[in-house]
Amino acid sequence: VVTGADVSATAVMSENAKGFDKTVTMRDVLLNYPYANQLCKVKLTGKQLRHIVEHSAGFLKKDRDGKIGFIDRWIKPKPMLYHFDVFYPVEYEADLSKPEGERITKLTLHGKPIEDDKIYHLAVNNYRAMGGGFYPEYSMDKIEMTLDKDYVQMFSEYLTHGDVEVDTKKNYKFY
């Protein structure tokens, strides 16, 4: 809502992040989002958005027992889960047995398929928007706006405005 973006992307910022309870402290905010990133709005084509979602799916693997987890290079020797993004409100599915570039089997926004040539706006942190995290589709020239406040300040202000409703509907599937 703040940026007017169609889609938002966020990362698992810390392997110690547990989310929030009913009562939230500043410590909880900092544990869940320890970086002083700012929120950006980025202009992308649907094809670029698909590549970004595809890249994120590439962090995952399915073992012989069918269990899905992170590829070792993202968790050993040091976890780097802050490079793995999840997206909302798009609905997406990825077949992890397929080769890179073919894993995304569904990518829709409000029930309609993402169109390759259509322009979409993505809300994402400035680290990612400038190309951080090995995502080749991001670059500074795609940034349309950057908010002055960092995430911690925005979370703190948002959480002090009363009860927060969280959409817990799962909008992704990896298989």
Where are these regions (language model features)?
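Feature captures C-terminal
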Residues: 2-175
